[in-house]
């Protein structure tokens, strides 16, 4: 997390992207529907891997692995066949809506799945250049086509990026 702390300090990060403080101390969030007051139980959106990881540590939790996330998604999808069609604004009390309204960071580094082989050699170079210094995000977002969302669908970004509807899901080890 030392790189994260350096990033926070050098970029003067004090809150998630698109949050705005007014002179009365009120926090508003710029959303797809304009500027709104924060919704207390809504998931935090537009955070970096560094912010997600630091919050998880503060909450005595951790970020899930990609594998744990896929198991979670498989379980949720088996219970709700219409999960992929959910595109409303997120609300924390409805797990089905919170699954694919935000990508969530995992602690897994982006690499190819075991046994993956590209269709063409030209694509191999394209794939490999993205597999350095990036982390996997799972779920999907309000901007993800519903046809793309599945248990194994993944996204990947560098740890400082936070523009892409990124959020957090916490995990804890079973004692």
Named regions from a protein language model:
Residues 1-151:
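Functional-site microenvironments in short loops/helix caps that host divalent-cation chemistry
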Residues 125-129, 155-162:
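Short proline/glycine-enriched turn/loop segments at secondary-structure junctions
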Residues 153, 157, 172-175:
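Sequence-pattern detector for short linear motifs
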């Amino acid at each position: 997390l030392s790189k994260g702390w350096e990033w926070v300090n050098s970029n003067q990060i004090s809150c998630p992207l698109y949050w705005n403080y007014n002179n009365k101390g009120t926090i508003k969030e710029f959303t797809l529907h304009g500027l709104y007051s924060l919704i207390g139980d809504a998931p935090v959106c537009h955070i970096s891997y560094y912010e997600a990881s630091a919050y998880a540590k503060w909450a005595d939790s951790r970020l899930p692995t990609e594998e744990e996330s896929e198991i979670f998604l498989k379980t949720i999808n088996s219970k709700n066949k219409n999960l992929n069609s959910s595109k409303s604004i997120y609300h924390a009390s409805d797990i089905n809506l919170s699954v694919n309204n935000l990508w969530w960071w995992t602690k897994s580094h982006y690499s190819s799945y075991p046994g993956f082989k590209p269709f063409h050699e030209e694509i191999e170079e394209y794939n490999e250049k993205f597999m350095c210094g990036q982390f996997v995000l799972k779920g999907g977002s309000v901007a993800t086509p519903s046809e793309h969302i599945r248990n194994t669908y993944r996204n990947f970004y560098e740890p400082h990026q936070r523009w892409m509807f990124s959020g957090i899901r916490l995990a804890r080890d079973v004692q």
